[in-house]
Amino acid sequence: MGNITAKLVKDLRDKTGAGMMDCKKALNETEGNLDKALEWLRKKGIASAEKKSGRVAAEGSIGSYIHTGSRVGVLLELNCETDFVARGDIFQSLLKDVSMQVAACPNVEYVSIDEIPEDVVEKEKQIEMGRDDLSGKPEQIKEKIVEGRIAKRLNELVLLSQPYIKDSSLTVEDLVKQAAAKIGENIKVRRFTRYTLGEGIEKNQMDFAEEVASMQKN
């Protein structure tokens, strides 16, 4: 692997407008070759998508997805810049795919890391700091281990960080950026709600016993 310097990352950011982590990943994937890293970002749809990310996305559409068996349902708001794009096939296909992703990810609660409340982050930190396998370790090492574990846990709660269900080499964020690059507009997942049949309803023991008995008869 080539030597990935801060200057190399900065040069790639200046050329593409992509985020620092995306630039680092691109350079790592291409062994520090700037031209190949630029091409890698373009193939991922990141280079041009990042330049659009600051533009206002106030149009869009609210989509719904009901999973087979009608036991899980999703409502999701996806925003773009114009009504014309919102009606297009690429946008509508993305809306459906991201809604399906939410249905497949029961632990996801937030769109992005930025949405996670500070008290949730602090709670996760306290849980990790109190784990038995960290006892006796120097404080500095403990902090680094906890930081890594918290980052992993928080990413599990975030929609944009999830591996795309149809192609695990992409994240949902990559998928959105690719669509933004194709249509030439900023696209944002604004919010979503996931419904599970019977969620929050406590079944009594008789209902459960009857279900088991019925299954045995069949």
UniProtKB/Swiss-Prot annotation:
- What Gene3D superfamilies does the record tag this protein with? 1.10.286.20, DNA helicase RuvA subunit, C-terminal domain, Elongation factor Ts, dimerisation domain
Give a GO cellular-component term.
cytoplasm
What does UniProt give as the signal peptide span? none
MF annotations from Gene Ontology: translation elongation factor activity
Record region (Involved in Mg(2+) ion dislocation from EF-Tu): 82-85
The organism's place on the tree of life at top rank:
Bacteria
The yes or no answer to whether the keyword Methyltransferase is present is no
Its annotated compartments are: Cytoplasm
Q: What is the protein named?
A: Elongation factor Ts
